[in-house]
Amino acid sequence: MRSIETPIIIDVEASGFGGMSYPIEVGIALDDDTKYCSLIIPAPDWDHWDNDAEKVHRIARDILETYGKPVQEVAAHLNRLLEGKTVNTDGWVVDKPWLTTLFYKAQMNMSFKVSPLQMILSEQQMERWHDTKDRILTEVKKHRH
């Protein structure tokens, strides 16, 4: 019988919903219970900002300037933590391009792979995942800022 591995999860928040958006926060939960989260200082040419997206993630641009870390620092830290691993996301169609944008701006190659969470979970498990994630996010938002 094959053992069940704990997946590594990554989530990215961005400045907006379209092609001009860029990552503003990245969070990961590793299979050994290590967690990492960082706000990202926007690069000088990253000027797109969507107020509707801000209402969703509740991160104001001035917060990024105050508490964020430089693009290169965040990308390098992700590479150190995730080298050779596969990370999973429930928002692959947006998280993967945002990570690509981060690493392109940092002038680094990603040392890890990004895969859709749907590749390892059944439809029923995905439903439970979304319900659980929504509950956790509600709790975290109560205490985050």
Where are these regions (language model features)?
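Alpha-helix capping at helix-to-loop junctions
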Residues: 87, 104-108, 126
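Short, flexible loop segments at boundaries between secondary-structure elements
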Residues: 111-135
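Conserved non-catalytic scaffold segment of RNase H-like nuclease domains
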Residues: 2-97, 101, 137
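Substrate-recognition/cap helix-loop segment adjacent to the acidic, metal-dependent catalytic center
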Residues: 95-114
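A polyampholytic, Gly/Pro-enriched intrinsically disordered region
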Residues: 59-62, 128-145
